[in-house]
Amino acid sequence: MGEWDFEQKAVVKAVEQAREQGELRLSTPGGRFQVRWDEGGSATALGQLAFFAEFLEVSGLFERWVGACPLAYTSPNAPAVVDVLGTWLLSILDGQWRYAHVTGLRGDAVAPGILGMKKILSDESLRRALSALAPNPPRRCTEAERAQRAAQLAKSTDWMDTALAESVDEALNTPWILDCDTTVKPLYGHQAGAEVSYNPQKPGRPSHVVHTYWISTMRLVLDAEVQHGKAHAAKHGLPRLCRLLMGLSSDQRPALVRGDIAFGNDGVMTEMESLAQGYLFTLRQTSGVKRLIERQWSRRDWQPVSQGFAAVEATLQLAGWSRARRVVVLRRRVRGDLIAEVKDDALKGQQTLLFAEAKDDLKLWEHTVLVTHTDHTLEAIGQLYRDRADCENGFDELKNQWGWGGYTTQDLERCHLSARAVALIYNGWSWSCRTAQ
């Protein structure tokens, strides 16, 4: 203890001497620098926050989000709602993915004042506030307590529904495309809904699944839904997708719903057709689809659809489908030298590269089969299919840079609430960047 006191006094004395000297000139590997102590100055690591806060003030997104929040405290020492949501916003905007990272913001004396806050809360206070917004009913509770928690959860859901709808409302007044996808969120604890299922990044690791509904080319999230790890099939996100479509007016409906092979099944397509909603999905390469490709391959009416692709359309009704549907087959010849990677189990997973030279008498093709409920031309469908890859960049950004891969708690309710909050802040930031440009 004595040595620690001595070290503390030495540090304090050195700092006081440096402050008395005023400006210091230091020689560093990068050149000469001047160091000056400023007792009254404040600093923030979030340099762009002031510009984003101006957008929030003009648009009123943050003010309405705080004003409609169903969080209510009874203790006189409880934090203000603006402090809770402001801390949450700053954490998301800083690129954090754990509640414990909030502690790194507490030394910021500028950011709270910009958002009209009094202070930045601790990570534990933020967790407790979110548990009050999205309560998880314990195993042992009365029916009255369970009903009260369910009512609070319904209020929070409506609150986020309204906030997300306001954040994308202007984008729905022009023709747009709704991209649907599923993101796997690996978990490293004992969380509710953590189940071992499809996980391409961490096979065998429990996970949650984030069903995402994305406004194509606008970099806006229409909604997000976190479910348990085995709910990665499209049928688990279909109810929410239908509610979103039915909640939009006819003028705001998407021109097209687009998805990968997970959505190319009869259940999803039948629901879209019942809503008179156009769609474009990819089909799995099942035996019936392969026979279709074989029948179409020798046709002479293949049409070029740019970027080396050629297309032809047909009608297909697979076993289990309720009706025949329009399909489009795309193909493109693969040119140049190819490399095939093979893992040998006998050599403990060692990789072996096989070099294949494409000759003129050997034609290699890449192909895909699309099913659609639209009357677009083949060239338009080919372009729409290629544009689908652009939304993957947005999903990757949200998961790896905006916190969709984190903010994990033991209950599923707060995980779901956090994912939607990340989507909301992301939408605001996207609008802010667009107005700045």
PLM regions: where:
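An anionic, glycine-rich sequence signature occurring as long contiguous blocks
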Residues: 2-6, 11, 15, 19-31, ...
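Active-site loop/helix belt of alpha/beta enzymes
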Residues: 264-274, 278
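A short, flexible helix-boundary coil/loop motif
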Residues: 425-437
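Flexible loop/turn segments at secondary-structure boundaries
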Residues: 109-112, 185-187, 220, 230-231, ...
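Dynamic "connector" segments at or just before major functional cores
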Residues: 1-205, 211-250, 272-275
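Structural motif
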Residues: 74-83, 360, 409-419
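Acidic/histidine-rich, metal-coordinating catalytic segments
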Residues: 181, 254-264
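Short amphipathic alpha-helical "interface-anchor" segments enriched in bulky aromatics
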Residues: 55, 102, 380-417, 421, ...
